[in-house]
Each structure stands twice: as C-alpha cells, then as structure tokens.
Amino acid sequence: MKISDIPFVTTDWSTVPPERHAGDSGEAIWRVQYFGPEENRIRVRMVEYSPGYSADHWCSKGHIILCLEGEMETTLADGRVMPLRAGMSYQVADGAEAHRSATKAGAKLFIVD
C-alpha cells in the first residue's frame, strides 16, 4: 500500500451509507470510503459483524484490521485459528495466508486495504 495524493480529510462514519453483506451465517455491515488515485486506491471501512457471523469466502487480500468492539476468530488456510479482541489488530499482505473470519457475539472493526 502506498498512501499518496490524499488531502487531509475527516470522516464521520455515522453519515456513510451502510452496505449489507450476507455471510454463510449472519451479516456484515460495511461503511466504506475510498481514498487516493484509481491505480492505488485505498479502501477504508468501518465493519460490524452481527452475532453468529461467518464469512462466506476465503480471502487472500491484504488488510490491516483493528478490532474496536467485541471479538472474532480468523481461521487461516493452514488450520490455525487467531483470536482478535477489542484493542487488538492483525496485519496480512496481499496473497499471504488465506483467511476467513467468524464471530459468536459480534464485532466492530476498522479495516484498511
């Protein structure tokens, strides 16, 4: 990720329209903003997983994820399970370990990719 051509800007996440994304179970509500030029666009999201959410796909995209509330587990393709609780983050590169997330009680995340 190269951060360039982004002027100083603030985001009031409560004004960003929600997008609903169904999981294998539960849903994820995304509030999304894009920054920077098209060829190097950075996606910034506030994401809320409902209780019982389980992702419907394996992801190979790189992310920086900060858990703001709740907790979730991310399962890696090799079988490892990584817990993420409020105040914790994880970082993974594009094309690195495929991962898939789930939560029992729900979680609120701040994600940059």
Regions from the PLM with identified roles:
Residues M1-R43:
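A short, N-terminal "cap"/entry segment at the start of jelly-roll beta-barrel domains
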Residues S89-V92, K104-D113:
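A short hydrophobic beta-strand segment most commonly corresponding to one strand
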